[in-house]
UniProtKB/Swiss-Prot annotation:
Keywords: DNA damage, DNA recombination, DNA repair, Metal-binding, Zinc, Zinc-finger
Protein role: May play a role in DNA repair. It seems to be involved in an RecBC-independent recombinational process of DNA repair. It may act with RecF and RecO.
UniProt-listed GO biological process terms: DNA recombination; DNA repair
Keyword Zinc-finger part of the UniProt annotation: yes
GO molecular function term, any single one: DNA binding
Identification of the protein by name: Recombination protein RecR
Amino acid sequence: MHYPEPISKLIDSFMKLPGIGPKTAQRLAFHTLDMKEDDVVQFAKALVDVKRELTYCSVCGHITENDPCYICEDKQRDRSVICVVEDDKDVIAMEKMREYKGLYHVLHGSISPMDGIGPEDINIPSLIERLKSDEVSELILAMNPNLEGESTAMYISRLVKPIGIKVTRLAQGLSVGGDLEYADEVTLSKAITGRTEM
């Protein structure tokens, strides 16, 4: 079907979002058309503001309005422990449980040779530099329990062991193939408490 150009552009834009196919994009585009103009302007401004006003922390890689982020700035945090996660949503999931008091390092992905993503394509080099300069005694690898997460954890473990830092992995209890961000607080709490050395 042929749509007016503004609708086609909007449908194409919505389809760039993960999990949004042509039918959902079409539904969202027509819903946007039915919205009040003020609401559409506010929505568009929120999209632009996310890109303009947020950055990544130069220390840990987490999204932030201020650099360094509030977690890295918090002097009450245990600076001897760093929890390595795949993305920002994992930090948010870990923070919800209110038990972990260390720092984070966000990789922004995982090693996936099938997708052409190698160690140099994610935030691993800055992690290694950070471990050499900070006084870290333990590195918790909190990758998602899937093939890519396991590969990433093994790769980091092999890199870090020679530095002499204890490397642990979250306890299993997380579903294999699942994502950390979808785990409930109790499961995450048990996984961090029961972590195992690699």
